[in-house]
């Protein structure tokens, strides 16, 4: 299926790019999410005329996301959960829970699909989680999972000493 991107898509292309993608990917993801349109002759002409509008709209969205990223930067989210003695959680911390807590902290609605987890969080500790609000912009938050507030504070102190040791080594 040939499509034309009307929004930037990470690892695929930018606005106005004409691509050949798998039928299922186009039909089930790109078209319903309004990330692309079919590459028909009328649509090709339309994109040539409206490419500047799409780029201006994307630039405006990007500026908004940069403001939100400034709020998100250096956020530390603490989750208090029940866990076994060896630190394994009875359950897990999901990307939806991270999105909900982050949304409250920055007063902006962040979808769980914007939270990128390398692996599921199933034990206590300190994790770095990627937040991707725009195809070209991402930020990182620190997620601390602990059994109690005091344990969370201990993890924070550990993280600070690791960071200061890393800075001392690089200097």
From Swiss-Prot:
The keyword Ribonucleoprotein applies. The keyword Hydrolase does not apply. It comes from the Bacteria. One of its GO terms (molecular function) is rRNA binding. Disulfide bonds: none annotated. Keywords: Ribonucleoprotein, Ribosomal protein, RNA-binding, rRNA-binding. One of its GO terms (cellular component) is ribonucleoprotein complex. One of its GO terms (biological process) is translation. InterPro entries: Ribosomal_bL9, Ribosomal_bL9/RNase_H1_N, Ribosomal_bL9_bac/chp, Ribosomal_bL9_C, Ribosomal_bL9_C_sf, Ribosomal_bL9_N, Ribosomal_bL9_N_sf. Pfam families: Ribosomal_L9_C (PF03948), Ribosomal_L9_N (PF01281). Coiled coil: none annotated. Binds to the 23S rRNA. HAMAP family: Ribosomal_bL9 (MF_00503). Belongs to the bacterial ribosomal protein bL9 family. This is Large ribosomal subunit protein bL9. It comes from Rickettsia akari (strain Hartford). The gene is rplI.
């Amino acid at each position: 299926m040939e499509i034309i991107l009307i929004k930037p898509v990470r690892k695929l292309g930018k606005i106005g790019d004409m691509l050949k993608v798998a039928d299922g990917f186009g039909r089930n993801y790109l078209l319903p999410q309004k990330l692309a349109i079919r590459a028909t002759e009328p649509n090709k002409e339309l994109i040539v005329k409206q490419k500047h509008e799409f780029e201006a709209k994307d630039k405006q969205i990007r500026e908004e996301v940069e403001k939100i990223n400034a709020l998100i930067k250096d956020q530390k989210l603490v989750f208090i959960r029940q866990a076994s003695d060896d630190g394994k959680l009875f359950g897990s911390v999901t990307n939806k829970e991270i999105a909900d807590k982050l949304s409250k902290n920055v007063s902006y609605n962040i979808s769980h699909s914007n939270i990128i987890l390398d692996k599921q969080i199933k034990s206590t500790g300190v994790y770095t989680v990627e937040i991707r609000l725009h195809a070209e912009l991402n930020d990182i938050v620190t997620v601390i999972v602990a059994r109690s507030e005091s344990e969370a504070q201990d993890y924070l102190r550990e993280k600070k000493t690791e960071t200061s040791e890393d800075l001392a080594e690089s200097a």
